[in-house]
Amino acid sequence: MQMKVLCILAISFALSACISRLSRPEISGQVIDQFDQPLGQVQVGETQTDMQGNFRLKERRYAAFLLKEIMYMEAPPVFVQERLSKQGYQPCDLQYFNSRGGGQRKGAQWKVGKIILQSNLNTAKQDEIPDCTVKTQEK
């Protein structure tokens, strides 16, 4: 009888075990204007840039049941979309996708680099928010 109880407890524990999955890596970068000047106080997701235009969004994780993860046999995809906005500038969406990114270890990072916000001057009203322009690093 005692062996049955221990066996049932062990199976229950194994089936309810959780593992940590990534829902958003730590995202960091700098927001600049079209003249390559840093922009302070830009809303980036749930945070704001400092006066040098730098920002950092914390990593987000969630717990997933081991049994469910075993059935899929691969790490889940990660899709992140964060809105950047500042009065006087055209808002944009920063997007990140990794087809198996949910399996990354704790401490995952995405260093974006420089993101260019365009001034609202001489722009017509848009129904859709465009993707952000990311300035690539010169080699």
Where do the PLM segments sit?
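Beta-strand secondary-structure signal
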Residues: 28, 56, 81-83
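Bacterial N-terminal signal peptides that target proteins for export
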Residues: 1-7
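Solvent-exposed strand-loop boundary residues in beta-sheet-rich modules
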Residues: 35, 50, 88-90
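Short, ordered, surface-exposed loop/turn motifs in non-cytosolic proteins
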Residues: 24-28, 33-48
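Short, acidic Ser/Thr/Gly-rich low-complexity loop/linker segments typical of extracellular
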Residues: 45-68
